[in-house]
Amino acid sequence: MSVADVKKGVEQKMQRSIEAFKNDLAKIRTGRAHTGLLDHVQVDYYGSMVPISQVANLTLVDARTIGVQPWEKNMVAKVEKAIREADLGLNPATTGDLIRVPMPALTEERRRELTKVVKSEGETAKVAIRNLRRDANEALKKLVKDKEISEDDERRASDDVQKLTDKHVAEIDKLVQTKEAEIMTV
């Protein structure tokens, strides 16, 4: 293993942490409708659980309503049930074969709770990034101990790892701020 391998590995892992954090943020409901909110809803399709996007077309009817059009008429009730049981606080209404999912307006108290959740998720993501930094620095120290690199090389590499850490932590902060602003916008 070389310094380049360590740096490349830690950068890939940090990027995956950021992607996981973005997915977590997408699950947090804001006042506005977006189809990504239903991405994690699983529907019982002839005995197997599949993502809602594989059995229905998701569209935005307006700023506060998602339209869900199942491809098979017999799936309407199952899709509606899956949305209702997804623990998103949504109450779908069916008209014919179109399921309308209105987004209830968020109360001020609920908005504040959601911003706390976003901050907490952000802190968790930062801890994950810092843990990756620690692992990379330990790998670099092991390379020095095994006499594969000099201490100067290790110092330079750990500075590079720190720069990567700072960059990814700043990205998390930016994502948190954006999501908080989205939640607090009435």
Swiss-Prot record:
Record's function text: Responsible for the release of ribosomes from messenger RNA at the termination of protein biosynthesis. May increase the efficiency of translation by recycling ribosomes from one round of translation to another.
InterPro entries to which the protein is assigned, alphabetical: Ribosome_recyc_fac, Ribosome_recyc_fac_dom, RRF_sf
A Gene Ontology term for the protein's cellular component: cytosol
Protein name: Ribosome-recycling factor
The keyword Transcription regulation belongs to this UniProt entry's keyword annotation: no
A GO molecular-function annotation: ribosomal large subunit binding
Family in the record: Belongs to the RRF family.
Biological processes per GO annotation: cytoplasmic translational termination
The UniProt record lists the keyword Cytoplasm: yes
Localization per record: Cytoplasm
SUPFAM superfamilies the UniProt entry points to: Ribosome recycling factor, RRF
Gene3D superfamilies with a match to the protein in the record: 3.30.1360.40, Ribosome-recycling factor
Domain of life: Bacteria
Pfam families noted in UniProt: RRF
Keywords from the UniProt entry: Cytoplasm, Protein biosynthesis
PANTHER family noted in UniProt: MITOCHONDRIAL RIBOSOME RECYCLING FACTOR PSEUDO 1, RIBOSOME RECYCLING FACTOR
